[in-house]
Structures are given as C-alpha cells and as structure tokens.
C-alpha cells in the first residue's frame, strides 16, 4: 500500500509534469480543454501505474483466493447499488457537517480549480473530459485498490466489519482533504458493504461512479 501511494505521488507530482515540461507544455498556460486533457492523462497514468504495482506485488500469491477482483454482470448487485444511492443525501449531510467542524485554515486564498473554471466557462469538451476522469477513471482504479485489494487483504487480520471500516478510512485519508474525511469514510463503508454483499467489484465501481457523477452535476448548478 505504501509503495502504491509513493507511486501515485511520484507519477502525478513529478513524472507527468516533467514529461509535459519536456514536451514544451506548461499546465498553467493551458486552455480549459488542455488542462482537462492533462488531468485525464495524469489520472490514466496514475491508475495504470498503480495497477501495475498491484500486479507485480501479487504475482507470488497467484492463483489469488476466490473473491479477489471479482467482476460479474449477473446477480442482484443492482439492488445493492440502488440502496447505496439512497444514502447519498446522508453523505452530503456529513460533508456539510465536516466543513463546519473543519473550516479552511487561514492563509492565502486558494484559487478556483480548473474543473470549476471549465464549468464557469461552460466549455463542453473540457467538462466532458473531466466527467470521464471522475465517473470512469477514478472509480475504476480506486475501487481496484481499496475494495479489490485492500479490503480482502485486511480480512486476513481482522473481522470483515473492521476491514470495511479500515479500508474506508484509508480511502478517505488518500484524498488528503480534512474537510472531506467524514463523508468519504462513510461513503467508503457503504461501498465496502456493497462489495462485501455482492462479492462483485463492479457494484462498488458503479456506485462510486454514480456518487462522483452526483457531485459533478451538483457543481454544474
């Protein structure tokens, strides 16, 4: 897990920016569409690097035990996803509570994010690229890491409920945002529960995608 975090940081903070600079691009001077494409390529690179690390580290444990990285279109996992969606308002409520408990630290005013700038500018191409990042890329690789790998790994050392909670806490902390810890922990528990019930990683991916889409659409209001 530490190796994955280090790889994620190295790729996103150093390798991709270095390659972009070597190619003659500067993120600060890119257009809305350029920044959106940059974010998409960065996310894809981080995801592929993380999956490659997992593939390499799990090589000596193959064949993997049943239940690891299970994908299945069949079954009643749609009902589990639907139930998870019903909890979205509670996640939203926890987000507001968390923000009230952890106000922004004093210091320089943080600028508007590139996502918000694209939404304000109503650039359809940039918004579509960001939509792919948050509803496709992020759910796939985050669920592979936290529900596909970490949660089953933790069940070797603790009961399933504690494994779900621990993987949810790791999921929240990996976002490096104190103002979002409470909703992300709860969301991680919900997605972990959906995965545990359905034994299907596709279920938690779809739920994750729907939540991210819900947040993205809320930003567009």
Residue ranges and their predicted role:
Residues 46-50, 130-133, 184-191:
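Hydrophobic core segments of transmembrane alpha-helices in multi-pass, intramembrane catalytic enzymes
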Residues 141-150, 166-173:
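Short juxtamembrane and helix-loop transition motifs at transmembrane-helix boundaries
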Residues 161-221:
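Functionally important transmembrane alpha-helices
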Residues 10, 43-48, 141, 161, ...:
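Hydrophobic alpha-helical transmembrane bundles that constitute the permease/transmembrane domains
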Residues 152-164:
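Solvent-exposed interhelical
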Residues 17-44, 58-138, 156:
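Juxtamembrane helix-loop-helix connectors linking adjacent transmembrane helices
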Residues 11-24, 49-57, 90, 94-98, ...:
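Alpha-helical membrane-inserting segments
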Residues 2, 40-41, 78-85, 128-132, ...:
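Hydrophobic alpha-helical transmembrane segments
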């Amino acid at each position: 897990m530490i190796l994955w975090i280090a790889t994620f940081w190295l790729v996103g903070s150093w390798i991709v920016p270095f390659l972009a600079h070597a190619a003659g691009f500067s993120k600060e001077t890119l257009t809305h569409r350029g920044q959106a494409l940059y974010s998409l390529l960065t996310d894809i690179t981080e995801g592929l690097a993380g999956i490659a690390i997992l593939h390499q580290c799990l090589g000596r444990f193959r064949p993997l035990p049943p239940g690891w990285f299970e994908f299945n279109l069949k079954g009643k996992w749609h009902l589990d996803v639907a139930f998870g969606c019903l909890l979205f308002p509670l996640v939203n409520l926890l987000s507001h509570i968390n923000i009230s408990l952890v106000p922004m630290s004093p210091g320089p005013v943080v600028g508007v994010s590139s996502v918000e700038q694209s939404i304000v500018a109503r650039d359809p191409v940039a918004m579509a690229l960001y939509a792919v990042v948050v509803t496709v890329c992020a759910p796939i690789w985050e669920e592979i890491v936290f529900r596909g790998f970490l949660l089953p790994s933790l069940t070797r050392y603790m009961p399933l409920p504690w494994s779900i909670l621990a993987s949810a806490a790791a999921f929240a902390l990996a976002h490096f945002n104190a103002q979002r810890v409470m909703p992300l922990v709860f969301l991680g528990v919900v997605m972990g529960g959906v995965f545990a019930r359905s034994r299907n990683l596709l279920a938690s991916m779809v739920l994750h995608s729907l939540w991210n889409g819900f947040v993205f659409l809320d930003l567009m209001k």
